[in-house]
């Protein structure tokens, strides 16, 4: 967690795919064997298409950080009503939502305006996510564009057949009651139209990082969102000691309901055990994981990481979670983490005082209904 804070602070201080065609059966040798080139073509055709859509300012910042960091195997889309912010974002595709509604001047902190802007730009949204197997929708809840547009984007993604995972922050208490109420309404809507919603409570983030200037606090929030999306994505797209595929992630995330995430790291001699303990103690993971119905675990380390160390992380989680829970885990290698290990845990089907609103069991009953929860003006 410390490096996340350090990275975010450094960032704040510094400031102030085409697919190959695959032939039919005639391309395969008569013997039934295939050349390496033919196998590579099949592999390319079968790769998971992942799209990350950043909605509003916070979502755009997440996409921008992923663009800077470099993410393997995902298309980055930034969608905003504020043209000034949008032009500064690094992304593969940019959508200026609701140009007629807002003239590119933002949503004025009104979620209704953000929703109407997204509905005006639905065709562009569908085009951006077309062909995706998995869509991440990331936003900061409480404001206008992110809160209003994220449910519209998630609904479009799910209707297109993609596994839809929303990763959102909830407001700092200091942002006021109106933003909190709007965040609650936005989260309710997202729960209705997403497979899984991962919630990052900004107030709990402050508990982890202590007192920081406002700008740096938001940078830390952006960094956590980026690490969360990147961690899940690269479980699928990057080779590792233990690889996961799209079907594995779908097993945990499809109809996962509300989830929370824990991030931990260690460079000690017992780095495997310490990184998982740090993740489990993370203020972001403000739940008793013993009641979770499933967990997704990503262990990242340098080239010196052994399979025994990675297995040690998972064994630690098995000891703490419901024995009937499903655990999917994988590892990825990052050469920059020599001598260090990072653990990311996503637990689904959880309840926490940090999660607003009703129990996720009624999600299916409200499927597709966006208009029955009011935002505050």
Curated annotation (Swiss-Prot):
Sequence positions that bind GTP: 57-61, 144-146, 175, 179, 222
Task: Tell me the Gene Ontology biological-process terms attached to this UniProt entry.
Answer: FtsZ-dependent cytokinesis; protein polymerization
Q: InterPro entries from the entry?
A: Cell_div_FtsZ (IPR000158), Cell_div_FtsZ_CS (IPR020805), EF_Hand_1_Ca_BS (IPR018247), FtsZ/CetZ (IPR045061), FtsZ_C (IPR024757), Tub_FtsZ_C (IPR008280), Tubulin/FtsZ_2-layer-sand-dom (IPR018316), Tubulin/FtsZ_GTPase_sf (IPR036525)
- Acidic residues composition bias: residue spans: 1-16
Broad class of the protein's primary localization:
cytoplasm
Output the Gene Ontology cellular-component terms. cell division site; cytoplasm
Give me the ranges of the annotated region Disordered: 1-33
Q: Which UniProt keywords apply?
A: Cell cycle, Cell division, Cytoplasm, GTP-binding, Nucleotide-binding, Septation
Q: What does this protein do?
A: Essential cell division protein that forms a contractile ring structure (Z ring) at the future cell division site. The regulation of the ring assembly controls the timing and the location of cell division. One of the functions of the FtsZ ring is to recruit other cell division proteins to the septum to produce a new cell wall between the dividing cells. Binds GTP and shows GTPase activity.
* PANTHER family on file: CELL DIVISION PROTEIN FTSZ-RELATED, MITOCHONDRIAL DIVISION PROTEIN FSZA
> What interactions and quaternary structure are annotated?
Homodimer. Polymerizes to form a dynamic ring structure in a strictly GTP-dependent manner. Interacts directly with several other division proteins.
Q: What is this protein called?
A: Cell division protein FtsZ
Origin organism of this chain? Haloferax mediterranei (strain ATCC 33500 / DSM 1411 / JCM 8866 / NBRC 14739 / NCIMB 2177 / R-4)
């Amino acid at each position: 967690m410390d490096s996340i804070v350090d990275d975010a602070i450094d960032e704040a201080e510094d400031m102030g795919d085409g697919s190959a065609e695959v032939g039919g059966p005639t391309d395969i040798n008569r013997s039934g064997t295939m050349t390496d080139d033919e196998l590579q073509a099949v592999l390319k055709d079968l790769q998971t298409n992942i799209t990350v859509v950043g909605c509003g300012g916070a979502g755009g910042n997440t996409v921008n950080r992923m663009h800077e960091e470099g993410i393997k195997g995902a298309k980055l889309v930034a969608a905003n009503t504020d043209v000034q912010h949008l032009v500064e974002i690094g992304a593969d595709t940019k959508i200026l939502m609701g140009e007629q509604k807002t003239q590119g001047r933002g949503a004025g902190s009104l979620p209704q305006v953000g929703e109407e802007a997204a509905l005006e730009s639905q065709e562009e949204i569908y085009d951006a996510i077309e062909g995706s197997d998995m869509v991440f929708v990331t936003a900061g809840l409480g404001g206008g564009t992110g809160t209003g547009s994220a449910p519209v984007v998630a609904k479009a993604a799910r209707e297109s057949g993609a596994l839809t995972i929303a990763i959102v922050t909830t407001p700092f208490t200091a942002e006021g009651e109106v933003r909190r109420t709007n965040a609650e309404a936005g989260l309710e809507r997202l729960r209705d139209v997403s497979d899984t919603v991962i919630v990052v409570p900004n107030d709990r983030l402050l508990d982890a990082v202590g007192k920081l200037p406002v700008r740096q606090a938001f940078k830390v929030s952006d960094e956590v969102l980026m690490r969360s999306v990147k961690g899940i994505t690269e479980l699928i797209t990057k080779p590792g000691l233990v690889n996961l595929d799209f079907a594995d992630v779908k097993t945990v995330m499809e109809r996962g309901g509300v989830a929370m995430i824990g991030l931990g790291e260690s460079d000690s001699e017992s780095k495997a055990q310490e990184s998982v303990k740090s993740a489990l103690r993370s203020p972001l993971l403000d739940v008793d994981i013993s009641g979770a119905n499933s967990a997704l675990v990503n262990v990242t380390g340098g080239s010196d990481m052994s399979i025994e160390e990675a297995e040690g992380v998972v064994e630690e989680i098995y000891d703490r979670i419901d024995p009937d829970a499903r655990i999917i885990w994988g590892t990825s290698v990052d050469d920059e983490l020599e001598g260090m290990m990072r653990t990311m845990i996503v637990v689904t089907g959880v309840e926490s005082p940090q999660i607003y609103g009703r129990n996720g069991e009624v999600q299916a009953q409200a499927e597709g209904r966006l208009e029955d929860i009011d935002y505050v003006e």
